[in-house]
UniProtKB/Swiss-Prot annotation:
Annotated PANTHER family: AGAP008170-PA, PROLARGIN
Naturally occurring in which organism (per UniProt): Bos taurus (Bovine)
This protein's domain notes: The basic N-terminal Arg/Pro-rich region binds heparin and heparan sulfate. Binds collagens type I and type II through its leucine-rich repeat domain.
SUPFAM superfamilies with a match to the protein in the record: L domain-like
Entry-linked Gene3D superfamilies: Ribonuclease Inhibitor
Signal peptide start-end: 1-21
Record function comment: May anchor basement membranes to the underlying connective tissue.
Protein name: Prolargin
Post-translational modification summary for this protein: Glycosylated; contains heparan sulfate.
Length: 381
């Protein structure tokens, strides 16, 4: 019994000694989070506005290779085989370079030009052709145009002009001012332009009050006048009698004065599409003009076919309010005997193309219409 007790005490002593000899395990310390850097407070400056001119414009194109002409502006191109021409178009230019005196044809379209400095044109007195389409020109200094006596063609389409430029050269033959913001025509601005053949003022802001009885005074040889896409309610007064082509589409014209076209012996082409014309606003024989060849009256409020000349070749009456058509009534030569199939076409009406679709008509084409207009090649209903 005593020996068993001694053995038990010895075993406990051995276990206690072994436990004291082992190292004590400590828990691993968790990594501390890195301190976040403190952001300095940003001062509250006002936000800048959207970029405005000229910062919103693309950069000008780099200069091209050296030219064979020492006076050629680096930002332009001077073709060796065409020494009188200067091409500065589509180069993101803000300013007009100095134009050499040898230049007759100047191309500056598709840029960001806002003005025409006098210094740029002081030597270019022989210019005949200037193309400034699609720029940002708001006004033309009359001192520039006064120094260009040989100018024949002036293109200023797609700019920001608010009035027709003054001091236009006397020898001008074509003046193109479409797609601007023009709402004013200075008095007498055309008075010295006897050589002008074409005047294009479409897509502007011209109203009836702009046109006075003397607005077109001086345009003795004008052949083409384009006033389409404006805000006219009346026919313009005192249009030059030499006119051949008259464009008045997309206005708000409601009526044509009696005998309005009688004073135009050379008028061959009329466009009055997209207006507000009705039978009440069309006096009898309004379009019965001896030299008229093409007449556009589509997209109006016309309910009957107007009287036409026997020389008319193309008639557009589509998209109106026409319900019926009587060939006997509209026949210029008042043909009654439809049994006459004579081959003599000397006095037969010249109408070759007739468009009537978009009305209230239904096929077939009336027989009396075909008997009158025997030269018809196409009828659209």
């Amino acid at each position: 019994m005593r020996s068993s007790l001694c053995w038990l005490l010895t075993l406990l002593l051995i276990l206690a000694t072994a436990a004291q000899g082992q190292p004590t395990r400590r828990p691993r310390p968790r990594p501390r989070p890195r301190p976040r850097p403190r952001l300095r407070p940003t001062p509250s400056f006002p936000q800048p506005d959207e970029p405005t001119e000229p910062t919103d414009l693309p950069p000008p194109l780099p200069p091209g290779p050296p030219s064979v002409f020492p006076d050629c502006p680096r930002e332009c191109y001077c073709p060796p085989d065409f020494p009188s021409a200067l091409y500065c178009d589509s180069r993101n230019l803000r300013k007009v370079p100095v134009i050499p005196s040898r230049i007759h044809y100047l191309y500056l379209q598709n840029n960001f030009i806002t003005e025409l400095p006098v210094e740029s044109f002081k030597n270019a007195t022989g210019l005949r052709w200037i193309n400034l389409d699609n720029n940002r020109i708001r006004k033309v200094d009359q001192r520039v145009l006064e120094k260009l006596p040989s100018l024949v063609f002036l293109y200023l389409e797609k700019n920001q002009l608010e009035e027709v430029p003054a001091a236009l050269p006397r020898n001008l033959e074509q003046l193109r001012l479409s797609q601007n913001q023009i709402s004013r025509i200075p008095p007498g601005v055309f008075s010295k332009l006897e050589n002008l053949l074409l005047l294009d003022l479409q897509h502007n802001k011209l109203s009836d009050g702009v046109f006075k009885p003397d607005t077109f005074q001086g345009l003795k040889n004008l052949m083409q006048l384009n006033l389409a896409h404006n805000t006219l309610r009346k026919m313009p007064p005192k249009v030059p009698s030499a006119i051949h082509q008259l464009y008045l589409d997309s206005n708000r014209i409601e009526a044509i004065p009696s005998g309005y076209f009688k004073g135009f012996p050379n008028l061959a082409f009329i466009r009055l599409n997209y207006n507000q014309l009705s039978d009440r606003g069309l006096p009898k024989n309004s379009f019965n003009i001896s030299n008229l060849l093409v007449l556009h009256l589509s997209h109006n409020r016309i309910s009957s076919v107007p009287a036409i000349s026997s020389r008319l070749e193309h008639l557009y009456l589509n998209n109106n309010s026409i319900e019926k058509i009587n060939g006997t009534q509209i026949c210029p030569n008042n043909i009654v005997a439809f049994h006459d199939f004579s081959s003599d076409l000397e006095h037969v009406p010249h109408l070759r193309y007739l468009r009537l679709d978009g009305n209230y008509l239904k096929p077939p084409i009336p027989l009396d219409l075909m008997m009158c207009f025997r030269l018809l090649q196409s009828v659209v209903i």
